[in-house]
Amino acid sequence: TKPYGFQAFYPGPGLGGHCIPIDPFYLTWKAKEYDMSTRFIELAGEINTHMPDHVVVRLRQVLDRKSGIALSRARILLLGMAYKKNVPDMRESPSARLMQILLGHGAAVAFHDPYVPTVPKMRDYPELFGRNSVALENVGADDFDAVLIATDHDNIDYAALARLNIPVIDTRNAFARRGLPMDNVTKA
């Protein structure tokens, strides 16, 4: 019914941005004033809130199965800090929560994001402030134990990531959509 400006939304590592993570909860709050149930919206919010935890569980499983490396000793490359592809916006980004969880488990975490060269100050993640994006062209197979794709920017050389031959946890289906080898890729 809407032929122009359609933008499909697909599951990922959690919700981000200025409206979608917040506005449904306003609707829930307002609906309660009229004694209306919004349980479906609340359940969706709970699921979306816990997606970063689910992604970390999948990452831990992959590291255990493919590398025998504990998450507490793992070196993780987080691909994408922006909340959606091809923008420099980190508002409510699930990538910040992912990095916080991984660091909390003792993992060494670096990130690459061509749109976010440095992590800005964020109220909920002050410990991430000032971290800098690493240059992807300088990354070798010995530098990281796994790659976690949180934001699938279009200007990333995913074929080069495939050649690293290390586990990739793909929360955005970036490899399959580009027809790249899936041997080391796990969807999350």
How would you name each of these model-derived features?
Residues T1-A188:
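Structural/interface elements that position substrates and couple domains in central-metabolism enzymes
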